[in-house]
């Protein structure tokens, strides 16, 4: 039986009463709570601007939020315990990877160097896992990074991000540049990682093809509020809809209608009203 490295931790991700805002802006999250068990594959869904990327970055330890117990990954503080990321136990792959070098900031991955130079430059890697990922992502080690397409560059970056056997993986729209075959093969690899090693994955995406049988959990965010968090097979709407896309589309359309109703009517300024803007005419 395969060893489940992360199974010793019942709650792989735990967020308790989280509040967060950027600078002096209104809070994005207020009293936000989320619990995910080890081995789960959670889809994170919501409209653009709902807070998905911010939540993933908080879970990845990129933003400090409250005390050490507010955001816990593998029973450790996501922000304060830097060993989580340094050890590879916690890994984050975001959309910015298509143009930047991981934690190296805004350094473009378009220099004249090979895919082999990048992939084999990561030390302490299991050769079998490395070869498996190279084959899985159909990477040509002779690719020159300044000449490849965005999709090919994305494959190299995903490979580098998965070389260390993670325990918690946070994915933010990482498959947008991949073709159908590469995307489905990668999802199958992720599923094996969860089932065989007990790893936990949170995946934010707007592409829902094939995810009905892939995900184990779903979390739906609207305006920084967790509207739903449940096992996929316990969501009532899925039992009466043809697919996941239809369900999420209905949720997003519903929240759009509510937003339109709550928008304030524009203030109309009349020449007969006392107004600073009309002082010119008086």
From Swiss-Prot:
Tissue specificity remark: Expressed in root elongating zone and root meristem, as well as in elongating etiolated hypocotyls.
Protein family membership: Belongs to the ABC transporter superfamily. ABCI family.
Protein's name in the database: ABC transporter I family member 21
Residues that bind ATP: 46-53
Source domain of life: Eukaryota
Gene: ABCI21
Residue intervals of the ABC transporter domain: 13-248
GO biological process, one term: response to red light
Keyword set includes Translocase: no
Keywords: ATP-binding, Cytoplasm, Nucleotide-binding, Transport
């Amino acid at each position: 039986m395969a060893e489940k490295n992360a199974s010793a931790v019942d709650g792989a991700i735990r967020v308790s009463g989280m509040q967060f805002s950027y600078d002096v802006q209104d809070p994005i999250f207020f009293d936000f709570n989320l619990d995910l068990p080890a081995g789960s594959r959670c889809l994170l869904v919501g409209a653009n601007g709902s807070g998905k990327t911010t939540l993933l970055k908080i879970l990845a330890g990129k933003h400090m939020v409250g005390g050490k117990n507010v955001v816990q990954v593998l029973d450790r503080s996501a922000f304060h315990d830097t060993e989580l990321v340094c050890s590879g136990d916690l890994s984050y792959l975001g959309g910015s990877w298509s143009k930047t070098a991981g934690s190296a900031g805004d350094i473009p991955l378009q220099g004249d160097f090979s895919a082999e130079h990048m992939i084999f430059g990561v030390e302490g890697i299991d050769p079998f896992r490395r070869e498996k990922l190279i084959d899985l992502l159909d990477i040509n080690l002779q690719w020159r990074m300044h000449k490849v397409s965005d999709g090919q560059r994305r494959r190299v970056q995903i490979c580098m991000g998965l070389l260390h056997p993670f325990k918690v993986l946070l994915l933010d729209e990482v498959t947008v540049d991949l073709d159908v075959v590469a995307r489905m093969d990668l999802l199958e690899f992720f599923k094996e990682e969860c089932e065989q090693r007990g790893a936990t994955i949170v995946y934010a995406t707007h592409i829902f093809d094939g995810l009905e049988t892939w995900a184990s959990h779903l979390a739906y965010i609207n305006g920084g509020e967790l509207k739903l968090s449940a096992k996929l097979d316990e969501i009532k709407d899925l039992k009466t809809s043809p697919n996941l896309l239809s369900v999420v589309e209905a949720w997003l359309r519903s929240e759009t209608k509510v937003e339109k109703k709550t928008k304030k009517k524009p203030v109309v300024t009349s020449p007969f009203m006392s107004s600073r803007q009309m002082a010119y005419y008086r």
